[in-house]
């Protein structure tokens, strides 16, 4: 029902580790009006299937799988699963879209990436996420981009400490495996309940985009590389915040 119009991969060799970035698209490829959708931490581009289908008449909807998710490559060096690496990939993709009219839609982690992309240059130097080399490279790339709109979901200008703890707990279940799709759906309903009320069909859809079948174990497992969770341990984030003089997170 929500199958993409096109699916393809980009070979990216300009980063610390060559890899493939997989993209799903809805709508006409020649449409210069683009909506670029960025998914959450443990989700993938197929989450935007209903969204892409709805807007495909008027827009070219482009949805990448962040590296380590969906059909994109898994990195050998797990420490590279970081915001600067994701931003480089997205900028690489944007450069190939050749569009001057891009609307950014970001959910959760995707929203954080979208805010960095739309922000003024100084945000890179003000953030502990970026090294000096990251700042130089990203500011060069970012200067080429012109976004017309920014739409955020499940993220905002302030961070709630309780929500960070909940996220840390929720991602701990993501290393599980499931003997059937039904068992996986039950787990997804429980651990993604903050998504709000959904029909049985919608929960099934969200589950199918979340799991893959592992032929070796003959079980269903989350679609992503478990290594994506390691860089986001809360202690590391708190240490980073304290290193730049932030003593508390606003609620």
For each predicted feature, which ranges?
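N-terminal cap/lid segment of alpha/beta-hydrolase-fold proteins
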Residues: 1-20
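Active-site loop/oxyanion-hole signature of alpha/beta-hydrolase fold enzymes
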Residues: 16-17, 63-105, 134-138, 143
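Conserved HGGG/HGGXW glycine-rich cap/lid loop of the alpha/beta-hydrolase fold
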Residues: 22-76
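Aromatic pocket-lining residues of Rossmann-like dinucleotide-binding sites
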Residues: 55, 117-121
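Gly/Ala-rich beta-loop-alpha elbow adjacent to hydrolase catalytic centers
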Residues: 106, 110, 114
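Flexible "cap/lid" loop of the alpha/beta hydrolase fold
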Residues: 130, 135-181
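Helix-loop "lid/cap" segments that line or gate small-molecule binding pockets
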Residues: 168-174, 186-197, 209-212
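Conserved serine/cysteine hydrolase catalytic core
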Residues: 214-251
């Amino acid at each position: 029902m929500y199958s993409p119009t096109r699916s393809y991969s980009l070979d990216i060799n300009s980063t610390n580790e060559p890899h493939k970035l997989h993209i799903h698209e809805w709508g006409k490829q020649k449409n210069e009006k683009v909506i670029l959708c960025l998914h959450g931490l443990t989700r993938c581009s197929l989450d935007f299937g209903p969204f892409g289908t709805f807007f495909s008449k008027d827009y070219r909807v482009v949805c990448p799988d962040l590296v380590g998710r969906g059909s994109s490559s898994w990195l050998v060096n797990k420490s590279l699963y970081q915001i600067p690496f994701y931003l480089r990939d997205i900028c690489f993709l944007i450069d190939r879209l050749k569009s001057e009219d891009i609307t950014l839609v970001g959910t959760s982690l995707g929203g954080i990436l979208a805010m960095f992309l739309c922000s003024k240059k100084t945000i890179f130097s003000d953030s502990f996420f970026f090294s000096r080399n990251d700042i130089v490279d990203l500011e060069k790339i970012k200067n080429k981009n012109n976004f017309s709109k920014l739409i955020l979901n499940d993220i905002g200008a302030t961070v709630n400490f309780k929500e960070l703890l909940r996220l840390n707990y929720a991602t701990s279940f993501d290393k599980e495996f499931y003997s059937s799709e039904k068992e996986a759906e039950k787990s997804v309903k429980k651990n993604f309940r903050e998504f709000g009320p959904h029909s049985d069909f919608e929960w099934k859809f969200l589950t199918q985009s979340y799991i893959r079948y592992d032929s070796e174990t003959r079980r269903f497992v989350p679609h992503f590389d478990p290594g994506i969770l390691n860089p986001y341990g809360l202690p590391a984030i708190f240490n980073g915040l304290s290193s730049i003089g932030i003593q508390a997170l606003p609620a």
